[in-house]
Amino acid sequence: MDVRIVDFLETRVAVLEHHGPPELEHQTARRLVQWRLQHRLPPDRHRTYGVHYTDPRTTPPEQHRVDFCVSVDEDVAPNPEGVVTKVIPGGRCAVARHLGSRANVSAAAHLYEVWLPKSGETLRDFPIFFHYVNVGPHLQDRELITDVYLPVR
Protein backbone atom coordinates (compact mmCIF):
# COMPACT_ATOMS: atom_id res chain seq x y z
CA MET A 1 0.00 0.00 0.00
CA ASP A 2 1.37 3.40 -1.00
CA VAL A 3 1.72 5.85 1.91
CA ARG A 4 2.78 9.45 1.46
CA ILE A 5 3.34 12.36 3.83
CA VAL A 6 1.36 15.54 3.11
CA ASP A 7 0.74 18.87 4.80
CA PHE A 8 -3.00 18.97 5.41
CA LEU A 9 -4.47 22.47 5.54
CA GLU A 10 -6.62 23.38 8.53
CA THR A 11 -10.23 22.82 7.52
CA ARG A 12 -13.39 24.22 9.11
CA VAL A 13 -16.16 21.62 9.06
CA ALA A 14 -19.85 21.30 9.81
CA VAL A 15 -20.19 18.21 12.00
CA LEU A 16 -22.90 15.79 12.98
CA GLU A 17 -21.58 13.62 15.80
CA HIS A 18 -22.31 9.90 15.87
CA HIS A 19 -22.24 8.16 19.25
CA GLY A 20 -23.20 4.50 19.25
CA PRO A 21 -23.06 1.30 17.23
CA PRO A 22 -21.16 1.40 13.93
CA GLU A 23 -24.09 -0.27 12.17
CA LEU A 24 -26.17 2.88 12.83
CA GLU A 25 -23.61 5.27 11.30
CA HIS A 26 -25.61 5.37 8.06
CA GLN A 27 -28.50 7.05 9.92
CA THR A 28 -26.23 9.85 11.15
CA ALA A 29 -24.63 10.21 7.73
CA ARG A 30 -28.08 10.42 6.11
CA ARG A 31 -29.07 13.24 8.49
CA LEU A 32 -25.91 15.16 7.55
CA VAL A 33 -26.64 14.64 3.85
CA GLN A 34 -30.12 16.13 4.34
CA TRP A 35 -28.65 19.11 6.20
CA ARG A 36 -26.02 19.51 3.48
CA LEU A 37 -28.69 19.55 0.76
CA GLN A 38 -30.77 22.13 2.65
CA HIS A 39 -27.73 24.39 2.94
CA ARG A 40 -26.59 23.91 -0.67
CA LEU A 41 -23.16 22.46 0.11
CA PRO A 42 -22.47 20.20 -2.89
CA PRO A 43 -19.67 17.62 -2.61
CA ASP A 44 -17.81 19.03 -5.60
CA ARG A 45 -17.17 22.25 -3.62
CA HIS A 46 -17.42 21.05 -0.01
CA ARG A 47 -15.38 18.01 0.95
CA THR A 48 -16.80 15.16 3.01
CA TYR A 49 -14.85 13.79 5.99
CA GLY A 50 -15.19 11.32 8.83
CA VAL A 51 -13.16 11.84 12.02
CA HIS A 52 -12.84 8.46 13.75
CA TYR A 53 -12.25 8.77 17.49
CA THR A 54 -12.57 5.04 18.18
CA ASP A 55 -11.75 1.76 16.46
CA PRO A 56 -15.01 -0.15 15.93
CA ARG A 57 -13.04 -3.43 16.03
CA THR A 58 -12.01 -2.87 19.67
CA THR A 59 -14.49 -0.35 21.11
CA PRO A 60 -17.79 -1.39 22.70
CA PRO A 61 -20.61 -0.29 20.36
CA GLU A 62 -22.12 2.14 22.86
CA GLN A 63 -18.75 3.96 23.14
CA HIS A 64 -18.08 4.17 19.39
CA ARG A 65 -17.68 7.76 18.14
CA VAL A 66 -17.34 9.33 14.67
CA ASP A 67 -17.82 12.90 13.45
CA PHE A 68 -19.36 13.11 9.98
CA CYS A 69 -18.20 16.35 8.40
CA VAL A 70 -18.64 18.71 5.46
CA SER A 71 -16.08 21.45 4.81
CA VAL A 72 -17.58 24.93 5.18
CA ASP A 73 -16.40 28.51 4.75
CA GLU A 74 -18.29 29.98 7.71
CA ASP A 75 -19.25 28.79 11.18
CA VAL A 76 -22.54 26.91 11.37
CA ALA A 77 -25.43 28.77 12.99
CA PRO A 78 -27.28 27.00 15.83
CA ASN A 79 -29.78 24.59 14.31
CA PRO A 80 -32.31 21.94 15.37
CA GLU A 81 -30.40 19.17 13.58
CA GLY A 82 -27.47 19.45 16.00
CA VAL A 83 -24.87 20.26 13.35
CA VAL A 84 -21.94 22.14 14.92
CA THR A 85 -18.72 23.76 13.73
CA LYS A 86 -15.37 22.10 14.40
CA VAL A 87 -11.90 22.26 12.85
CA ILE A 88 -9.73 19.51 11.44
CA PRO A 89 -6.29 20.87 12.34
CA GLY A 90 -3.62 21.42 9.75
CA GLY A 91 -0.29 19.64 9.86
CA ARG A 92 1.66 16.65 8.65
CA CYS A 93 -0.30 13.52 7.86
CA ALA A 94 0.45 10.11 6.46
CA VAL A 95 -2.09 9.35 3.72
CA ALA A 96 -3.13 6.05 2.18
CA ARG A 97 -5.84 5.59 -0.43
CA HIS A 98 -8.55 2.97 0.00
CA LEU A 99 -10.53 1.83 -3.03
CA GLY A 100 -13.88 0.10 -2.62
CA SER A 101 -16.45 -0.40 0.10
CA ARG A 102 -16.29 1.84 3.14
CA ALA A 103 -17.64 -0.94 5.35
CA ASN A 104 -14.05 -1.99 6.14
CA VAL A 105 -11.43 0.62 5.28
CA SER A 106 -8.30 -1.54 5.38
CA ALA A 107 -6.00 1.46 4.83
CA ALA A 108 -6.71 2.63 8.40
CA ALA A 109 -5.51 -0.64 9.92
CA HIS A 110 -2.52 -0.67 7.55
CA LEU A 111 -1.43 2.83 8.63
CA TYR A 112 -1.66 2.01 12.35
CA GLU A 113 -0.53 -1.60 12.39
CA VAL A 114 2.00 -1.88 9.53
CA TRP A 115 3.20 1.51 8.36
CA LEU A 116 3.45 3.47 11.66
CA PRO A 117 5.69 1.02 13.57
CA LYS A 118 8.15 0.91 10.64
CA SER A 119 8.02 4.61 9.74
CA GLY A 120 9.80 6.25 12.66
CA GLU A 121 6.92 8.75 12.82
CA THR A 122 4.94 9.58 15.96
CA LEU A 123 1.26 10.41 16.23
CA ARG A 124 -0.12 13.88 16.77
CA ASP A 125 -2.96 14.56 19.19
CA PHE A 126 -5.79 14.20 16.65
CA PRO A 127 -7.52 11.03 15.51
CA ILE A 128 -7.35 9.35 12.16
CA PHE A 129 -9.74 10.87 9.62
CA PHE A 130 -11.12 9.91 6.26
CA HIS A 131 -11.69 12.11 3.21
CA TYR A 132 -14.54 10.57 1.27
CA VAL A 133 -13.25 11.65 -2.14
CA ASN A 134 -16.43 10.71 -3.96
CA VAL A 135 -19.89 10.46 -2.43
CA GLY A 136 -23.41 9.94 -3.67
CA PRO A 137 -26.16 7.38 -4.11
CA HIS A 138 -25.20 6.75 -7.74
CA LEU A 139 -21.84 5.17 -6.83
CA GLN A 140 -21.23 1.43 -6.56
CA ASP A 141 -18.98 0.15 -3.74
CA ARG A 142 -16.24 -0.69 -6.24
CA GLU A 143 -16.14 2.98 -7.33
CA LEU A 144 -15.63 4.50 -3.88
CA ILE A 145 -12.39 6.36 -3.12
CA THR A 146 -11.38 7.16 0.46
CA ASP A 147 -8.16 8.90 1.49
CA VAL A 148 -7.18 7.96 5.04
CA TYR A 149 -5.18 10.60 6.97
CA LEU A 150 -3.12 9.73 10.04
CA PRO A 151 -1.84 12.91 11.74
CA VAL A 152 1.89 12.65 12.54
CA ARG A 153 4.49 15.02 14.01
Place the predicted regions along the sequence by residue:
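A solvent-exposed interaction/effector surface
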Residues: 1-153
